[in-house]
Regions:
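Aromatic-acidic/polar surface patches that form glycan- and anion
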Residues: 59-64, 68, 84-88, 133, ...
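Alpha-helical elements of Rossmann-like donor-binding domains used by nucleotide-donor carbohydrate transfer enzymes
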Residues: 3-11, 93-97, 142-146, 168, ...
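Short, hydrophobic secondary-structure boundary micro-motifs
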Residues: 21, 33, 156-160, 185-186, ...
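Donor nucleotide-sugar recognition loop
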Residues: 61-67, 76-107, 111-114
C-alpha cells in the first residue's frame, strides 16, 4: 500500500527499543508470520492469531524473514546472519540470538506484505522446478538440524530430526521400488540434507547430482 513506508517511520519513531520487527501477511490465513520457540506458547499463539484482533505490535520470539526491520544499532557485530546457512532458518537463528542477548523481537499488524513465496528464478521456472524442489528439500533439512545443534545441543538436534531422517530414508527406498522418480528425489534430497548436517558437512548443495 502507498502508506506502507509512512507506517514504518511511525512505528520506528514510537518504538526505539526494538531489535527486530517482522511484517505480517496481507492475504495469508494459514501460515504464521511470527511465533514462539516454546511449543506450548507457540500453539496457543497459533490458535488465537487468526481469531483475535491483533495489537499494533506483538512481542514474539521469532518472525519470518520475508520482510523484516532490523535495528542495526542494537547489534555490536553488524555481520548479523550466520553464513553457514545457505537457505532457510537464518531469520530464526537471528531471532534466537536476539532473545538470548536480551533483545526485543516484534510482529506488527500495521505492516502488511504480500508474500509470494518460492517465486525466485528457479521456483518460477517450470523447466527448473524439479531442481528447485531438490534445492529446497536439501537445504530445509540441513538448516533444520544445524539450527537445533547450534542453539540447543547435538543430541537434542538428533532427537528432533530422528523421525524425519528414518522416514525420508524409508520413503526413498519405497518410491525407488515404485519407479516414482519425483517422490524418490523428494525424500532422497531430504535424507541427504539431514545426513550432511548430522555429520558436520557444509551446506554446499547447489544443484549437483549425488547419484
Amino acid at each position: 500500500k502507498a502508506d506502507f513506508f509512512k507506517k514504518v517511520i511511525k512505528l520506528i519513531n514510537k518504538n526505539k527499543k526494538f531489535w527486530i520487527i517482522g511484517c505480517q501477511y496481507s492475504n495469508d490465513t494459514v501460515y504464521l508470520p511470527a511465533g514462539f520457540f516454546n511449543t506450548k506458547k507457540h500453539n496457543l499463539f497459533q490458535k488465537n492469531f487468526f481469531k483475535n484482533k491483533k495489537k499494533s505490535l506483538i512481542k514474539v520470539d521469532w518472525v519470518t524473514g520475508c520482510s523484516m526491520l532490523i535495528n542495526l544499532k542494537k547489534f555490536k557485530n553488524k555481520d548479523i546472519f550466520d553464513k553457514n546457512y545457505f537457505l532457510y532458518f537464518e531469520e530464526f537463528d537471528l531471532c534466537k540470538s536476539t532473545n538470548d542477548n536480551g533483545g526485543f523481537v516484534y510482529s506488527s499488524s500495521d505492516l502488511k506484505v504480500h508474500h509470494l513465496g518460492f517465486k525466485g528464478s528457479l521456483g518460477s521456472n517450470n523447466l527448473l522446478k524439479n531442481e528447485a524442489n531438490k534445492l529446497r528439500d536439501w537445504h530445509w533439512m540441513w538448516s533444520y538440524f544445524y539450527f537445533y545443534k547450534k542453539n540447543y545441543n547435538y543430541l537434542y538436534a538428533l532427537f528432533k530430526v530422528s523421525g524425519k531422517f528414518f522416514k525420508s530414508f524409508l520413503k526413498m527406498i519405497f518410491y525407488t521400488f515404485l519407479f516414482n522418480k519425483v517422490d524418490r528425489d523428494k525424500y532422497l534430497f531430504r535424507f541427504l540434507g539431514l545426513l550432511f548436517s548430522i555429520i558436520g558437512l557444509k551446506s554446499n548443495y547447489r544443484g549437483r547430482r549425488f547419484y
